[in-house]
């Protein structure tokens, strides 16, 4: 899969294009290939140093672009690389099955867990099928149905958050979008099993919060979490969506800032260049975090688990 480079990555893209061109010559150049090995090695070293330099000083706007990268791993990618024996479950038993939310039972190192997450889709047909990762009320009701199932069978719940927001269409509002989100917030706060939430891309407003109440809330290094998109914020405050970079900086939507505010618990490191550059390494980092946090949470008696979660929520808003 060829990588899509973002605007701020152009110097890296140019270097990697040169490296690939030299590799191509090396593969088909006969004896002259020997002379190219050293040059390729030097360029690879230069590319690595450039990546480290660029990614050591990313602004909020660059991070927001990375969070939306079309090749970033989605929920089903984590299902593939982190879990075993995944069985997808469908439908809210009231209206329909929303494909923007994927959910099901799987095993994590042999342990049964319930997985729930947003799914955006990559190709045009799949994006439409998944509604670009923007769930409707039936998606959140499906999620709640399966959370309750997990509670009955004492299975930990793991959620993957990656949405621009809940779908704002007329039909979704008529079917009770706000009620579905509010009900999930209330019910998740009282679940008697461990709940670990992971923001893996965009954490957009109530659409993210609806599967984001848990004992641990983690964010990937280059993910975002906010009440509105930078473009939306800029359109409201400055009547100009081109001011999105300024809005992103002002909103404090990046993982490091949210960790300072104690709105999230842990930042999961991404491979150099972002999660999209190495799905397998990103999944390994995710798996290690989940195993460690689950081992800790499973030691707590039920009443302690609920009290811990309650105190965590009550601390929101205090500096």
UniProtKB/Swiss-Prot annotation:
The keyword Protein biosynthesis does not apply. InterPro entries: Acetyl_CoA_COase_a_su, ClpP/crotonase-like_dom_sf, COA_CT_C. It is an enzyme of class 2 (transferase). Keywords: ATP-binding, Cytoplasm, Fatty acid biosynthesis, Fatty acid metabolism, Lipid biosynthesis, Lipid metabolism, Nucleotide-binding, Transferase. It comes from the Bacteria. Acetyl-CoA carboxylase is a heterohexamer composed of biotin carboxyl carrier protein (AccB), biotin carboxylase (AccC) and two subunits each of ACCase subunit alpha (AccA) and ACCase subunit beta (AccD). This is Acetyl-coenzyme A carboxylase carboxyl transferase subunit alpha. It comes from Vibrio vulnificus (strain YJ016).
């Amino acid at each position: 899969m060829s990588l899509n480079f973002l605007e701020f990555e152009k110097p890296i893209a140019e270097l990697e294009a040169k490296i690939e061109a030299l590799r191509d010559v090396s593969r088909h150049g006969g004896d002259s290939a020997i002379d190219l090995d050293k040059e390729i090695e030097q360029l690879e070293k230069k590319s690595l140093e450039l990546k480290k330099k660029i990614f050591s000083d990313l602004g909020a706007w660059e991070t927001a672009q990375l969070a939306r990268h079309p090749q970033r791993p989605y929920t089903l990618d984590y299902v593939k690389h982190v879990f075993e024996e995944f069985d997808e479950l469908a439908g809210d038993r009231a209206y329909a099955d929303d494909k923007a939310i994927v959910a099901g039972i799987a095993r994590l190192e042999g342990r049964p867990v319930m997985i729930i997450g947003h799914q955006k889709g990559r190709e045009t047909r799949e994006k439409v099928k998944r509604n670009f990762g923007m769930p409707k009320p039936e998606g959140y009701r499906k999620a709640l149905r399966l959370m309750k199932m997990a509670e009955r069978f004492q299975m930990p719940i793991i959620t993957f958050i990656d949405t621009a927001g809940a779908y704002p269409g007329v039909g979704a509002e008529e079917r009770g979008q706000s009620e579905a989100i509010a009900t999930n917030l209330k019910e998740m706060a009282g679940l008697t099993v461990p709940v670990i939430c992971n923001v893996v891309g965009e954490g957009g407003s109530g659409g993210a919060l609806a599967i984001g109440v848990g004992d641990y809330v983690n964010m990937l290094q280059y993910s975002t979490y906010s009440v509105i998109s930078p473009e939306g914020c800029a359109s409201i405050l400055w009547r100009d969506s081109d001011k999105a970079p300024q809005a992103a900086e002002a909103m404090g939507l990046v993982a490091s800032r949210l960790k300072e505010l104690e709105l999230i618990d842990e930042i999961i490191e991404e491979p150099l260049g972002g999660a999209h550059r190495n799905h397998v390494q990103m999944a390994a980092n995710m798996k290690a975090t989940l195993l460690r946090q689950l081992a800790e949470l499973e030691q707590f008696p039920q009443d302690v688990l609920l009290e811990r979660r309650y105190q965590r929520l009550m601390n929101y808003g205090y500096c």
